[in-house]
Amino acid sequence: MPFGLIVIGIILAIAAYRDTLGELFSIIKDVSKDAKGFGYWVLAAVILGFAASIKPIKEPVNAFMILLMIVLLIRKRGAIDQISNQLRGS
């Protein structure tokens, strides 16, 4: 989780340095507006990220995080076909 926050901070710092924060936020708004239920997925990932810092439940939380990633990949129709097309180079 700290790594993710550092990456987000670096992205925001670069956008601020280039004076493109408005453009960055409009892109994020467009992406999140088109994806139904996007907020729920982000909230689930954040909760799992924080829960992973609790040592006794770290392994089950990691399993749920992997499951969340798999569901996000498969949820989008044609995602597997797009990935295979990209790997084939066509």
Swiss-Prot record:
Per UniProt, what is the membrane topology?
Answer: Multi-pass membrane protein
Keyword Membrane carried by entry:
yes
Can you say where in the cell this protein is located? Answer: Virion membrane
Query: Main localisation, per the record?
Result: virion
Q: Name one GO biological process term.
A: symbiont entry into host cell
Keywords (A to Z) from UniProt: Capsid inner membrane protein, Membrane, Transmembrane, Transmembrane helix, Viral genome ejection through host cell envelope, Viral penetration into host cytoplasm, Virion, Virus entry into host cell
Transmembrane segments annotated in the record for this chain: 1-21, 37-57, 60-80
Cellular component GO terms, alphabetical: membrane; viral inner membrane; virion membrane
| Function recorded in the entry | Component of the phage injection machinery. Required for DNA injection in the membrane transformation event. Involved in the formation of the membrane tail tube to connect the virus interior with the host cytosol. Essential for viral infectivity.
Q: What is this protein called?
A: Protein P18
Gene name of this polypeptide? XVIII
